[in-house]
């Protein structure tokens, strides 16, 4: 998801905060006194699975909905709403049988048509998550159109025909884009987006539980019968405008869980919150994207400038001094926690600080068209990004001898809206937190032609072909080989500049127990208990 993520993006796993103003109050609200509070951000869009591809909305949908499979804490896919998911001989057609006892929070049953119609809503309306359905028969290369490959066999069974054999199809189905929708939302998606009705372990606490720019309150879903039943009285997502304020609330035990701490406490948070912290790698990576539509950044000139800028960033120094070792310099576009990761991909020397080579490449670009102006990196001020953006801009400035600086946006939503409208006047920070644990998920949604998370409008036909080939691979080894070949193309073109792999660096209050963080750096909220 595109950190998609306000912080992870320092994606997704990272951080939210607000002083004691809008959203600053963290008093418990819900059905009881055992409500867990955690940080969040105001969702960019209505809370529908097809419209949500950023962390603010994604966190909330994760507790409101359950999919055909779910992911264990280590990222292993296990059956959830599905009783069985079976492929044919070449994995081009799958039969999905549902448990017959699952219900939405409004009491209606979760049936085959709730999946089929929900997925078709996404593709027929060309919603943001349509790209995840491009593998199905009937959709175009961008996942739009009617999914003719879905057939209802009976109330609790349906089949899915894919364009090509897809051996990892089942493991993808835990992503929230593949969630079902109740009949009420299918009949009125606008209403469902403002007052989501899901089939997960939690539900909206009330019709006004979404207090925009303040918080979103959930309570346990009494109709839920799956394996992730809430061990608390609900979860309230508090929308912060700064990481520092979130950390202040956490330190005073006014907030229960913060999944990202501000740069100002990287050196001290583990001692200040002794025994109540997490600092571990997860499936995420941070970049900054340089849009194709910017002057000086297309064609051969653009390729030279992108490589020069990448080599002008001193990742080692920044990760040590700004992040105090809670980040690791990136060697590719994915994450080292994923199967098939390779730190030695051909061409990744472009991700190593090399000031002399950077100057040489910049001079070659100037010979094509002289540079003028200021190189900027856009970022959201509510995500704790200023320190590293300033350090990165200074590294570029000092190496290349050009003006470079950060370009702050008030909040994550404002930044995303500008990206969506193609209104960026410079580069912009972004990142990725795995939707499901696979290399493919880090590459196709962000860099395939027309993909919704491809906010820089990158397009390379050879890369697109390799994505199709990787998706159709019959073994993981074959898929990995193809995906690493695709990464060599990205390392030449640098549609985004990989910076570092983040740790989830967070903490929890003295008021909660059983706090764990999963494979993508998110707290496992249903397990958390209040003292």
PLM-predicted stretches and their roles:
Residues 31, 313-340, 384-394, 417-531:
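Detector for C-terminal structural segments
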Residues 111-120, 155-161, 201, 232-234, ...:
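Alpha-helical secondary-structure segments
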Residues 328-365, 383-387:
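Structural transition elements
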Residues 39-89, 197:
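N-terminal lobe/hinge region of extracytoplasmic solute-binding protein
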Residues 190, 196, 222-268:
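Ligand-site clamp/hinge motif
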């Amino acid at each position: 998801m595109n950190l998609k993520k306000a912080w992870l993006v320092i994606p997704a796993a990272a951080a939210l905060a607000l002083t004691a103003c809008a959203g600053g109050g963290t008093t418990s609200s819900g059905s009881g006194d055992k409500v867990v509070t955690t940080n969040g951000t105001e969702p960019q869009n209505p809370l529908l699975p097809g419209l949500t591809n950023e962390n603010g909305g994604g966190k909330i949908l994760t507790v409101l909905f359950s999919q055909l499979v779910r992911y264990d804490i280590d990222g292993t896919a296990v059956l959830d709403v599905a009783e069985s998911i079976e492929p044919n001989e070449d994995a081009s057609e799958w039969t999905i049988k549902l448990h017959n006892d699952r219900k939405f929070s409004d009491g209606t049953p979760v049936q085959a048509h709730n999946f089929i119609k929900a997925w078709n809503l996404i593709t027929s309306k060309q919603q943001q998550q349509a790209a995840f359905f491009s593998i199905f028969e009937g959709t175009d290369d961008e996942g739009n159109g009617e999914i003719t490959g879905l057939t209802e066999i009976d109330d609790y069974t349906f089949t899915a025909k894919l364009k090509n054999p897809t051996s990892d199809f089942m493991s993808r189905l835990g992503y929230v884009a593949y969630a079902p929708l109740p009949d009420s939302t299918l009949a009125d998606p606008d209403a469902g987006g403002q007052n989501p009705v899901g089939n997960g372990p939690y539900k909206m606490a009330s019709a006004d539980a979404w207090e925009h720019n303040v918080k979103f309150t959930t309570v346990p879903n009494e109709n839920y019968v799956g394996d992730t039943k809430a061990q608390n009285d609900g979860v309230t997502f508090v929308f912060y405008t700064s990481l520092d304020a979130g950390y202040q609330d956490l330190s005073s035990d006014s907030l229960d869980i913060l999944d990202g701490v501000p740069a100002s406490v990287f050196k001290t948070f583990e001692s200040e919150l002794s025994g109540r912290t997490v600092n571990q790698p997860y499936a995420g990576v941070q970049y900054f994207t340089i849009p194709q539509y910017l002057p000086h950044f297309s064609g051969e000139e653009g390729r030279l400038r992108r490589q020069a800028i990448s080599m002008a960033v001193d990742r080692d120094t920044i990760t040590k001094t700004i992040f105090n070792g809670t980040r690791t310099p990136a060697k590719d576009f994915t994450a080292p926690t994923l199967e098939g990761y390779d730190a030695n991909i051909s061409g990744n020397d472009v991700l190593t600080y090399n000031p002399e080579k950077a100057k040489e490449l910049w001079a070659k670009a100037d010979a094509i068209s002289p540079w003028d102006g200021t190189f900027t990196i856009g970022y959201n001020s509510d995500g704790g990004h200023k320190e590293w953006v300033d350090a990165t801009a200074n590294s570029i400035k000092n190496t290349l001898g050009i003006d470079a600086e950060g370009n702050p946006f008030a909040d994550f939503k404002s930044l995303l809206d500008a990206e969506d409208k193609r209104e960026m006047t410079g580069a912009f920070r972004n990142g990725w937190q795995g939707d499901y644990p696979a290399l493919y998920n880090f590459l196709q949604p962000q860099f395939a032609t027309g993909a919704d998370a491809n906010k820089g409008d990158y397009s390379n036909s050879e890369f697109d072909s390799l994505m199709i080939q990787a998706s159709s691979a019959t073994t993981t080894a074959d898929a990995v080989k193809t995906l690493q070949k695709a990464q060599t193309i990205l390392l030449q073109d640098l549609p985004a500049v990989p910076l570092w792999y983040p740790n989830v660096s967070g903490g929890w209050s003295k008021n909660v127990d059983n706090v764990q963080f999963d494979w993508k750096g998110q707290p496992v909220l249903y397990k958390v208990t209040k003292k």
